[in-house]
From Swiss-Prot:
This is Phenylalanine--tRNA ligase alpha subunit. HAMAP family: Phe_tRNA_synth_alpha1. It is an enzyme of class 6 (ligase). Mg(2+) binds at E252. Belongs to the class-II aminoacyl-tRNA synthetase family. Phe-tRNA synthetase alpha subunit type 1 subfamily. The gene is pheS.
Length: 338
């Protein structure tokens, strides 16, 4: 008991000079733990007389409380200092210029799709959609495509089984609309389509927009005027347009639409293969067989249909020479179209 004051003084000095919370914990264990120096003094009380024991016990408890209070005070000081240092280190200098958030932009294919849809919705068309996984009937048979047609071959179409496939065009949306609606019908059908093809101008997945108009008294002149006006508005300048006779099973007569090359103005360049013309879409008057199979009287109603590749239009509008660039997710390329 003689060295109690010295032991307390030693403990208080050690606490005062502690630099972190871990050191404080070690001091607490050293002095106040189960085998701590102050705790061990309590075991010496048995050697004292009954008269001395209460007074000695009170002194030891006072000493322990003094050390514990010093520990608590020092711990609070250290934690406060640590918090202050952390706040100072993390302080934001509001006078510094901000780091601007990079803004995104619509993909060029999305921009092109929206541009096409906006034109046709302004002249009374509605947007129709359908499943990308189609059955053979809606993708081929209902469109007057016989079983021996090359489009049904495995090298052109992704088949799941003999009856289910990934649609090769958005024409099935037209069929489903004709089956569920009566004329007049005015729709455009945007969406993803799939074909077994991949090179600088083809992709196994690409976007297509097809259009359909069915009503009484519709002629090829209506089709011609619609397409010419669309191309003029889409490319924002008057362009020469020509219609070449062609063949599609679902239209009769059918035509391929060429427009004056937007790169060289029709003078001839590498893009148009020095012809001055670029093919942009196929079109024609809806075949009577297609109307009849969809429950529409071909004697009363006529209609026209057209289809165009969205990536093809985007390539021509933005001067891109490789279709695959649209799907490479290269931000350096995509940032040009913000």
């Amino acid at each position: 008991m003689e060295n109690l004051d010295a032991l307390v003084a030693q403990a208080l000095e050690a606490v005062q000079h502690s630099e972190d919370v871990n050191a404080l914990e070690q001091l607490r264990v050293h002095y106040l733990g189960k085998k701590g120096e102050l705790t061990q003094l309590m075991q010496t009380l048995g050697k004292l007389s009954a008269e001395e024991r209460p007074k000695a016990g009170a002194l030891i408890n006072t000493a322990k409380n003094s050390v514990q209070e010093a520990l608590n005070t020092r711990k609070a000081d250290l934690e406060s200092a640590a918090l202050t240092a952390k706040l100072a280190a993390e302080r934001i200098d509001v006078t510094l210029p901000g780091r601007g958030q990079a803004s995104g932009g619509l993909h060029p294919v999305t921009r092109t799709l929206e541009r096409v849809e906006q034109f046709f919705t302004r002249i009374g068309y509605s947007v129709a959609e359908g499943p990308e996984v189609e059955d053979d009937y809606h993708n081929f048979e209902a469109l007057n495509i016989p079983g021996h047609h090359p489009a049904r071959a495995m090298h052109d179409t992704f088949y799941f089984n003999a009856n289910m496939l990934l649609r090769t065009h958005t024409s099935p949306v037209q069929v489903r609309t004709m089956e569920s609606s009566q004329p007049p019908i005015r729709i455009v059908c945007p969406g993803r389509v799939y074909r077994c093809d991949s090179d600088i101008t083809h992709s196994p997945m690409f976007h297509q927009v097809e259009g359909l108009l069915i009503d009484e008294g519709i002629s090829f002149a209506d089709l011609k005027g619609t397409i010419e006006e669309f191309l003029r508005v889409f490319f924002e300048k008057p362009l020469g347009v020509r219609f070449r006779p062609s063949f599609f099973p679902f239209t009769e007569p059918s035509a391929e639409v060429d427009m004056q090359c937007v790169i060289c103005g029709g003078h001839g360049c590498r893009v148009c293969k020095h012809t001055g013309w670029l093919e942009v879409m196929g079109c024609g008057m809806v075949h009577p067989n297609v109307l009849g199979m969809s429950g529409i009287d071909p004697e009363k109603y006529q209609g026209f249909a057209f289809g165009m590749g969205v990536e093809r239009l985007a390539m021509l509008r933005y001067g891109v020479n490789d279709l695959r660039l649209f799907f490479d997710n290269d931000l350096r390329f995509l940032a040009q179209f913000r």
